[in-house]
Amino acid sequence: MKQLFLTLLCALCSLSGFAQSFADVHKGGKFYSSVDEFVLFDNNPRYGRDAKSAAALTLGYTFNKRLGLELSGASFGYEWKYNPRYLSLDLQSYSFSKDRVRVVTSIGLALVQGHTNENKEYLTPTLNLGASLQYLCTKNAYVGLNFRKMEGHIGFNAFMMGVSFGGYF
């Protein structure tokens, strides 16, 4: 998985046609997709079976370019059989944007499904809070450093840090 991630990251960074800022990107495209790779720091072992890493695929739509509001949905799955998976819907906003760098904050809800360490299945809603520092490396592609906190009412919690790469189309 790590070799695939590094290969795709290098391919995105080597594309030609550099944009001057995220404002240039938003003039052309409203939809975007990204792939995220996370490391888990604060994962309740009862619900995560000691998972250490995870990957996510995100699809999004920018519906207000001036305010920087985006709606995104993520499908998230661990690499192990009994670890949790989630489907989330997040509202994102650009907290800071300057040329090729921006900070994106997000809040959302997710449904998390998995097995406990007693092998009992669970399905729980969670609250998601996130922040991402993103750098525009090509005309429509960016790389980012992400932080995400998920917390549910039955004790499920996870704090994740990771990298992402995505593009607008």
Locate predicted features.
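Active-site histidine-anchored catalytic micro-motif
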Residues: 131
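Extracytoplasmic loops and strand-loop junctions of Gram-negative outer membrane beta-barrel proteins
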Residues: 38-43, 112-115, 146-148
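Short glycine/proline- and aromatic-enriched beta-strand/turn motifs that initiate or cap beta-hairpins
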Residues: 19-66, 72-75, 162, 166-168
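Signal peptide-directed secreted proteins
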Residues: 137-169
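Transmembrane beta-barrel architecture of outer-membrane proteins
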Residues: 30, 52-54, 84-88, 124-128, ...
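Cleavable N-terminal export/targeting peptides
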Residues: 1-29
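Outer-membrane beta-barrel domain signature
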Residues: 22, 43-48, 76-82, 116-121, ...
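Gram-negative (and chloroplast) outer-membrane scaffold detector with strong preference
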Residues: 58-127, 135-141, 166-169
